[in-house]
């Protein structure tokens, strides 16, 4: 693994809620840019991000700009919107001291200069909780540690998912993407063809209404009988309310001696259990 798991834990997992909510909202501007300028696909993956470790950023797919393809993203440790071409950062906008509306206006100007459609005209097909700042400027001076830790959770999760998909035998996993609605980074393994195909989602959330901390999940479909659940590898447990899956929380992961190796073993073991139970 490339990620250094010993660097995680500087901030308790449950202490990332504010940073996560701010980053989640900030990341809606890049996805709006993608929706405005890319052809829609049925699974909505045109609107999703990839984790770019070199920038510690969630980045869109390439957008067809004048002069060459560009990407838009959020550099998580700084909560900074960036526009890149290749490996180069063309422009950046630090959100500290600025409102969400100002960030969107900045992006729209840059997109127009590049011959692209503005992000501000896009209406998202889902709702998010109210922006933590309302219409006030972002105050990030006291959130540097939390934003850095949030970025490390994304980086570590992406690394484990890459290791998992690289070693997966049999069915092919989908690309590893971060989804703008729920803000989770995940891959989907379809075990068969068809609209009601058996499948297993493997991913990581930075936290949500179910867990106020990052967690990793393995979600089989269709769900199992909750009364007859098999034992999971350490440190997992079954989550059955709201969604169904095997879960390892951030606290559980940090308590492991070998965090990266242990988490990969949990994900792989839970996947094998789910696949066997689904009969695939």
Q: What annotation goes with each model-predicted range?
A:
Residues 48-127:
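Long, hydrophobic/aromatic-enriched structural stretches that serve as scaffold segments
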Residues 35-44, 116-127, 166-183, 276-280:
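Short glycine-rich, low-complexity/disordered patches
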Residues 1, 241-280:
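TerminUS-proximal long segments
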Residues 63-94, 206-254:
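Intrinsically disordered, low-complexity regulatory segments enriched in Ser/Thr/Pro
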Residues 2-69:
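N-terminal ordered "arm"
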Residues 154-230:
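Secondary-shell segments that build the walls of catalytic and ion/ligand-binding clefts
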Residues 112-113, 118-120, 140-144, 151, ...:
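Short loop/turn segments that flank or connect secondary-structure elements
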Residues 118-171:
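Surface-exposed beta-loop interaction hotspot
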């Amino acid at each position: 693994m490339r990620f250094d798991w010993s660097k995680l834990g500087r901030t308790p997992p449950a202490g990332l809620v504010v940073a996560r909510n701010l980053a989640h909202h900030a990341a809606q501007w890049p996805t709006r840019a993608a929706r405005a300028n890319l052809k829609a696909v049925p699974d909505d993956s045109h609107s999703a991000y990839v984790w770019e470790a070199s920038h510690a950023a969630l980045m869109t797919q390439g957008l067809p700009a004048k002069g060459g393809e560009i990407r838009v993203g959020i550099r998580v440790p700084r909560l900074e919107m960036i526009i890149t071409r290749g490996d180069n950062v063309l422009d950046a906008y630090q959100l500290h001291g600025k409102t969400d509306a100002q960030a969107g206006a900045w992006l729209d100007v840059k997109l127009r200069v590049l011959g692209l459609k503005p992000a501000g005209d896009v209406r998202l097909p889902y709702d998010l909780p109210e922006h933590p700042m309302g219409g006030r400027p972002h105050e990030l001076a006291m959130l540097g540690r939390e934003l850095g830790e949030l970025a490390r959770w994304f980086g570590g999760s992406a690394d484990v998912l890459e290791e998992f998909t690289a070693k997966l035998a049999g069915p092919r996993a989908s690309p590893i993407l971060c989804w703008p609605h729920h803000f989770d980074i995940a891959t989907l393994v379809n075990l068969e063809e068809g609209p009601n195909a058996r499948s297993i989602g493997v991913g990581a959330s930075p936290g949500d209404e179910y867990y106020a901390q990052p967690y990793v999940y393995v979600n089989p479909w269709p769900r199992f009988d909750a009364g007859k659940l098999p034992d999971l590898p350490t440190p997992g447990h079954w989550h059955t309310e709201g969604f169904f899956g095997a879960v390892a929380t951030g606290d559980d992961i940090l308590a492991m001696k070998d965090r990266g190796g242990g988490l990969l073993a949990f994900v792989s073991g839970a996947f094998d259990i789910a696949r066997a139970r689904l009969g695939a």
